[in-house]
């Protein structure tokens, strides 16, 4: 399998120096600080998550760099915690409406499990609604229970990750597209909206 470098290269400061979210997180010569949700972990009681949105509003006022959320489709108590419980994209859209400056980041979006069209539609929508503040931390996934649940072979996650990143990058391009990928194909169609600044920073995280 050959994947074009231009479609899979990650974020770098020169490429995203004018991106509102990325430039807040990776400011040259500055140490930046953000928060990683949740601050209190779910253990059967949703009330532990109360008040987090108000906290995010406050860190936005206090000039923090970023708020991070996680992509945890299934809670497996034998493996680890449930993250912030809420769907990461729905929750970031909610937080985008309550903030003005803080970068909105995922750590990590599981590209090997989610279809790139759905990923792009959600990501580009949040980027537009937030004024270009979205940064995607991306990963291939590590929770064994999730792969058979999605009908994906865990041993193939690296290849699916690369395929999804390539597909996702192509969807940022303007105009009608012709895409032929192992994950799907279409002719003369376009995914809308597009990211505010033409692309979304992708950062491999774990």
Describe each PLM feature range.
Residues 37-38, 77-78, 105-108, 150-151:
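A short, mixed-charge helix-start or loop-turn motif at secondary-structure junctions
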Residues 38-42, 72, 109-111, 139-143:
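Active-site beta-loop-alpha junctions enriched in small/polar residues
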Residues 2-98, 194-202:
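N-terminal beta1-alpha1-beta2 module of alpha/beta enzyme domains
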């Amino acid at each position: 399998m050959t994947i074009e470098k231009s479609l899979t290269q990650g974020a770098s400061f020169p490429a995203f120096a004018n991106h509102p979210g990325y430039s807040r997180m990776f400011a040259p010569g500055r140490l930046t600080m953000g928060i990683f949700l949740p601050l209190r972990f779910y253990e059967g009681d949703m009330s532990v998550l109360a008040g987090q949105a108000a906290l995010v509003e406050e860190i936005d006022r206090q000039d923090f760099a970023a708020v991070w959320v996680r992509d945890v489709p299934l809670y497996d108590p034998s493996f680890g915690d449930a993250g912030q419980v809420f769907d990461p994209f729905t929750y970031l859209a909610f937080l985008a409406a309550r903030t003005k400056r803080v970068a909105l980041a995922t750590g990590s979006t599981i590209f090997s499990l989610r279809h790139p069209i759905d990923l792009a539609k959600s990501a580009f929508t949040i980027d537009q609604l937030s004024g270009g503040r979205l940064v995607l931390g991306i990963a291939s996934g590590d929770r064994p229970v999730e792969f058979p649940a999605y009908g994906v072979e865990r041993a193939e996650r690296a290849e699916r990750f690369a395929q999804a990143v390539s597909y996702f990058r192509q969807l940022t391009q303007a105009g009608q597209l012709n895409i032929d990928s192992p994950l799907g194909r279409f002719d003369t169609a376009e995914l809308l909206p597009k990211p505010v600044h033409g692309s979304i920073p992708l950062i491999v995280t774990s």
